[in-house]
Amino acid sequence: MVSVARLVFMLGPLLCLGAQLSSSQHWSHGWYPGGKRELDSFTTSEISEGIKLCEAEGCSYLRPQRRNILKNVILDALAREFQKRK
């Protein structure tokens, strides 16, 4: 029982100190609890030029690239295996 009390005594201040030092979200600056943001606060100036350009033409960076990465990893592994066999 003494070790449990000692553990609580040590973890309590450590938890309080960790909460103070962490970079948690502050609810001022237009944010509400739960990560919600006021929708009316967005202005047209917050839309980046890259997104405006992508509306006119297709943007490849908006498409998921996971398939290409996986394909490249598999091809590299096969190429290494082929080089080992030579």
UniProtKB/Swiss-Prot annotation:
Q: What does this gene product do? A: Stimulates the secretion of gonadotropins.
Asked if Hydrolase is a keyword of the record, the answer is: no
Q: Which domain of life is it from?
A: Eukaryota
Q: Which GO terms describe its molecular function?
A: gonadotropin hormone-releasing hormone activity; gonadotropin-releasing hormone receptor binding
The signal sequence is 1-24
High-level lineage: Eukaryota, Metazoa, Chordata, Craniata, Vertebrata
Specify the species.
Oncorhynchus mykiss
Location comes to:
Secreted
This protein's major location comes to secreted
Keyword Signal present in the record's keywords: the answer is yes
The modified positions for Glycine amide read G34
Q: Which family does it belong to?
A: Belongs to the GnRH family.
Residues with the Pyrrolidone carboxylic acid modification:
Q25
One CC-aspect GO term: extracellular space
Keywords of the record, alphabetical order, are:
Amidation, Cleavage on pair of basic residues, Hormone, Pyrrolidone carboxylic acid, Secreted, Signal
Q: What Pfam family is a match for this entry?
A: GnRH
- Name the UniProt record assigns to this protein: Progonadoliberin-2
